[in-house]
Amino acid sequence: PPLNLSLVDTLVAQGPPEWRFPPFRPERPRTFLKNPLALLGKRDVLLYHPFEDYAAVERFAEAALAEEVEEVWATLYRTGEENPLAEALIAAARKGKRVHVLLEGRARFDELLNLRWYLRLVRAGVEVLPLPERKVHAKAFLILTREGGYAHLGTGNYNPTNGHHYTDFSLFTARKEVVAEVRAFFQAMAEEKTPRLGLLRTGEGIRRLLLEAVLHEAHPKGRLILKFNHLTDPELLEALVYAASRGARVDLLVRSTLTRLHPAIRAKSLVGRFLEHARAAAFRAGGEWRVYLTSADAMPRNF
């Protein structure tokens, strides 16, 4: 029979202290936590959880209760049993804000929990958007005011347990062009249409962007780093092999499934205290690094 890995938690809990990591205290972005919207009016904020406190995401959600906020949009995927961010959405709706949530009911293993949250959200007056044909895996939170808006885009789930144990990026911004894109994404979801975006990418658009970027690096001075949980897309793997064969340095950080290896490609799996969860792709592009973040793994079903 397969090994029951849940027993490892019990084993470590009952074992000697040297089996356990010392207490961990994340860095707290104090200025952001004090007034996230005020700081975002001045500059963008990029955090890497859990080294930088996931509480920043929950504090951003609580900013939806501010007087100047008129409307809130959010995606919820793996909610968990207790979720301050979801509670903030409920509180905002009860305070009279227009709150719209895309609650993905097909998150594997969390279907019943998400159904419970669905009932709570609806009772509070939140508009829960109809599920589109395709699973929505994007992690986006949008706050709209009379003057403009603020957006959060992340690689991780809006889930406090995950937020303290998974490595993930969070980008917070008030840039008008990004806010407009996130708003267009949510509007398309509400109207059950395919999003037409310029800055952001979804589905097949992610694959096209990655393929173009990889092939652009297919020369002796090329340099690229890809980090995913799963890297199984045949087209992308073929492009990586081609770039490496043309002399590019290709580094892969893949936590779980990698379906093709090549002598010219460096591939590693990071195993440590936290679960590697951030997905990122970096390309040097002639000296200037371009970095893309995504919540999606490089798998055919996701593209």
Regions found by a protein language model. Give the residues of each.
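Catalytic grooves of carbohydrate-active enzymes
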Residues: 225
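Hydrophobic alpha/beta core scaffold segments
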Residues: 249-253
